[in-house]
């Protein structure tokens, strides 16, 4: 008897399931591999560029913080000697001016609300 089966009007012969190993186009496979390698190198290059930019920006931030720290150290040494650096004076007077402006604007607002409450 024949081992073939009839399914849906078609005769199927017994054998392995799935794809049959066809002739693989070696040139196409090689080209796909080369393309994949090119893309991988491009991704790697971009990743390294990003990391280098990140490192340089962090190094710039570190330098700026070191300069700021040195400035604060100098201010502290000057204050230990009884001198008040002009920068600190400017900061303090700037804060006092902004506080006085805030207080005056609060008084103005409070005066307006008092005037409104007395009007009835």
Swiss-Prot record:
Region (Leucine-zipper), start-end ranges: 62-69
Modifications made to the protein after synthesis: Phosphorylated by AMPK.
Keyword Transcription regulation among UniProt keywords: yes
GO molecular function, one term: DNA binding
Region (Basic motif): 29-60
Chain spans, region Disordered: 1-24, 93-120
Matches recorded under Gene3D superfamilies: 1.20.5.170
Keyword line: Activator, Differentiation, DNA-binding, Host-virus interaction, Nucleus, Phosphoprotein, Transcription, Transcription regulation
GO biological process: cell differentiation; positive regulation of D-glucose import; positive regulation of DNA-templated transcription; positive regulation of fat cell differentiation; positive regulation of lipid biosynthetic process; positive regulation of peptidyl-serine phosphorylation; protein stabilization; regulation of DNA-templated transcription
UniProt superkingdom: Eukaryota
Domain (bZIP) ranges: 23-86
Keyword Repeat: no
CC annotations in GO: nuclear body; nucleus
Biased amino acid composition, Basic residues: 10-21
Localization (cell): Nucleus
UniProt xrefs under Pfam families: bZIP_2
Stated family: Belongs to the bZIP family. ATF subfamily.
Function per UniProt: Probable regulator of CREB1 transcriptional activity which is involved in adipose cells differentiation. May also play a regulatory role in the cell cycle.
Subunit details: Interacts with CREB1; regulates CREB1 phosphorylation, stability and transcriptional activity. Interacts with immediate-early (IE) protein BICP22 of bovine herpesvirus-1 (BHV-1).
PANTHER family: CAMP-RESPONSIVE ELEMENT-BINDING PROTEIN-LIKE 2
Protein name: cAMP-responsive element-binding protein-like 2
Source organism of the structure: Bos taurus (Bovine)
Gene behind this protein: CREBL2
């Amino acid at each position: 008897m024949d081992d073939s089966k009839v399914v849906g009007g078609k005769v199927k012969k017994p054998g392995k399931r799935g794809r049959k190993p066809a002739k693989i186009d070696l040139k196409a496979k090689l080209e796909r591999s080369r393309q994949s390698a090119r893309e991988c190198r491009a991704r790697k290059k971009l990743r390294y560029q990003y990391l280098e930019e990140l490192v340089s920006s962090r190094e710039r931030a570190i330098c700026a913080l070191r300069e700021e720290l040195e400035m604060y150290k100098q201010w502290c040494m000057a204050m230990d000697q009884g001198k008040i650096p002009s920068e600190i004076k400017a900061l303090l007077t700037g804060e006092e001016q902004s506080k006085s402006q805030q207080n005056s604007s609060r008084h103005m607002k409070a005066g307006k609300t008092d005037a409104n409450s007395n009007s009835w």
